[in-house]
Amino acid sequence: MSYELIAAKRVDLGTGASRRLRRAGKLPAVVYGAGKDAVSLELDHNTLYHAVKHADFHTSVLELVIDGQKEQVKVAAFQMHPYKQQVLHIDFARV
């Protein structure tokens, strides 16, 4: 199964900005690696929450569309809330 995720670059960074994103149904994320600078992103939470449940999501090469530009990435790490059904943050590594 192939995954295509739509993301947008984040302007506001930090704890408060991340909390505001989560309240708005978004998910803070970062993509890094391949000799390029790290880019802070925001994604739709529900899309990622349902994708994280599938084992192949964690091992597949994903297509991440950042403001119209496509990048090949893999999931490097993600954080779940201790008791809520909520993804808190996800890291992607460029392939």
From Swiss-Prot:
Gene Ontology MF annotations: 5S rRNA binding; structural constituent of ribosome
Alphabetic keyword roster: Ribonucleoprotein, Ribosomal protein, RNA-binding, rRNA-binding
GO cellular component terms, A-Z: cytosolic large ribosomal subunit
Pfam family, one: Ribosomal_L25p
InterPro entries reported for this sequence: Rbsml_bL25/Gln-tRNA_synth_N (IPR020056), Ribosomal_bL25/Gln-tRNA_synth (IPR011035), Ribosomal_bL25_long (IPR001021), Ribosomal_bL25_short (IPR020055), Ribosomal_L25_dom (IPR029751), Ribosomal_uL5_bac-type (IPR020930)
Role played: This is one of the proteins that binds to the 5S RNA in the ribosome where it forms part of the central protuberance.
NCBIfam families (alphabetical): bL25_bact_ctc (TIGR00731), PRK05943.1 (NF004612)
Subunit note: Part of the 50S ribosomal subunit; part of the 5S rRNA/L5/L18/L25 subcomplex. Contacts the 5S rRNA. Binds to the 5S rRNA independently of L5 and L18.
Family recorded in the similarity comment: Belongs to the bacterial ribosomal protein bL25 family.
The name this protein goes by in its record: Large ribosomal subunit protein bL25
Gene source species: Chromobacterium violaceum (strain ATCC 12472 / DSM 30191 / JCM 1249 / CCUG 213 / NBRC 12614 / NCIMB 9131 / NCTC 9757 / MK)
